Amino acid sequence: MASKAKKRAVGNGIQRPLGAPGQREEEEEEEDEVEDEEEDEDDSDEEEDEVDEIVDEEVNIEFEAYSISDNDYGGIKKLLQQLFLKAPVNTAELTNLLMQQNHIGSVIKQTDVSEDSDDEVDEDEIFGFISLLNLTERKGTQCAEQIKELVLSFCEKTCEQSMVEQLDKLLNDTSKPVGLLLSERFINVPPQIALPMHQQLQKELSEARRTNKPCGKCCFYLLISKTFMEAGKSSSRKRQDSLQQGALMFANAEEEFFYEKAILKFSYSVQGESDTRLGGRWSFDDVPMTPLRTVMVIPDDRMNEIMETLKDHLSV
């Protein structure tokens, strides 16, 4: 099924290692013969130097948003695995559900490049996506139940009983549907792209509500955000009440604004599950970071205010 362009997203530079390795100048050998072992060591040192000399350059890449299609299965599933890591969540089923309800949601792809460009572009490669799964409507599906069990289990481990009861009631109140908001992208895609993606999703949700389509009605949004904090600081139960927003860093910078408006929020560590191949290395300026997941619940009536805040900070 061909994807149709939905909305042009923000073009921006992302960091990519480019350029050929630097050439190391060889010193003239004073002796005619060199031991084999010494030659091997020199070769090894040369390879290390070449790796060190690779430089990062900023490449300007234009992105565009497309409606979700069958070709996006692998890319969406990979990004969901980046979010849930080793958690017992059926990401294959979740991906299929998101694709079935393609009246909402978008994927981010690179804008078509000219034929004379030297860049090799995979037209089906996605750099991110946004969508929503109505957990109340999808009650009984394996992935929806697993996600609810996941957040409740970590809430029990890290929060006071009153918050556990509040979250349990919220997730199981069928009269007030809860939507799982999913906004995932690779770590080097700039946050400015989030503004048109979220704006488009809100329009699609409003249209779904007007036409009585799935996902249209949500009273609350559940968001599981990739965050991290300086290693050594705790996200335990005692720490949750005093955990300041400033101590958290958000992989998706715009999700800090959702955090500010959340009526319920807590974090848990995924230190033993992190995969640097997908999410990048969790360190800044050589300061080790502990990868977390931050769960937050935002009422629907606060979403317009969040969208205005995103517009103020992310408009280009």
Swiss-Prot record:
Name of the gene: Bccip
UniProt similarity note: Belongs to the BCP1 family.
Name of the protein in question: BRCA2 and CDKN1A-interacting protein
Region listing for Disordered, in residue ranges: 1-57
Keywords: Cell cycle, Cytoplasm, Cytoskeleton, DNA damage, DNA repair, Nucleus, Phosphoprotein
Modified residues annotated as Phosphoserine in this record: 44, 114, 283
Subcellular location per the Swiss-Prot or TrEMBL entry: Nucleus; Cytoplasm, Cytoskeleton, Microtubule organizing center, Centrosome, Centriole; Cytoplasm, Cytoskeleton, Spindle pole
GO molecular function: kinase regulator activity
Tissues in which the protein is found: Expressed in the testes (at protein level).
Positions of region (Interaction with BRCA2): 61-169
InterPro entries on file: BCP1_family
Subunit structure: Interacts with BRCA2, CDKN1A and MTDH/LYRIC. Interacts with DCTN1/p150-glued and ACTR1A/ARP1. Interacts with alpha-, beta- and gamma-tubulins. Interacts with TENT5C; the interaction has no effect on TENT5C poly(A) polymerase function.
Chief localization: nucleus
